[in-house]
Amino acid sequence: MLQGVQRGYNLPELITLEQYQYIRDHKELDPVLAGFVGFGCSFGGKWYGGYARNKTGTNYALQSKRSLLKDMATLQNAEFVCGDYRRLCIPPGSVIYADPPYNNTTGYGGEKFDTIEFWIAMQLLADTGHTVFVSEQEAPPGVACIWERPFTRTLDRNKSNQFKVTEKLF
């Protein structure tokens, strides 16, 4: 998705429930659109975790588009890679930003994610001259947190199931 947006892909400003369902069921037809809808138009930003909607009629597609384009304005020269971190060929001295599934949550695609193996790999990359940043809520002992922000996470559209979490960057 990020590669497509970087190349000038025109993101939609509105996605209906019917469009959401069609795109979800036909991701292969337009991977950029599938990525945008899968995260930006899904409840809680969870990959196809249900069509995002609320009582106030928030336009999640427009909100996501604006946010993404604002972020991309400063990332035009970045190289985005989507894939298994264990299979990437990373040039020496790279800056790496990793956004793994949070520990003790559902992994991407519903698969179990090996958090311990991931952190070992990130430490190895850091030890071999890369600058590594990881978004998570927790890290192994000895890994420094360089930024954090508390926020409220909502598990249903009626906001009756909310809890506080702290997003961190290590």
Residue ranges of model-derived segments:
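Class I S-adenosyl-L-methionine-dependent methyltransferase module
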Residues: 1-82, 86-87
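Class I S-adenosyl-L-methionine
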Residues: 78-97, 102-170
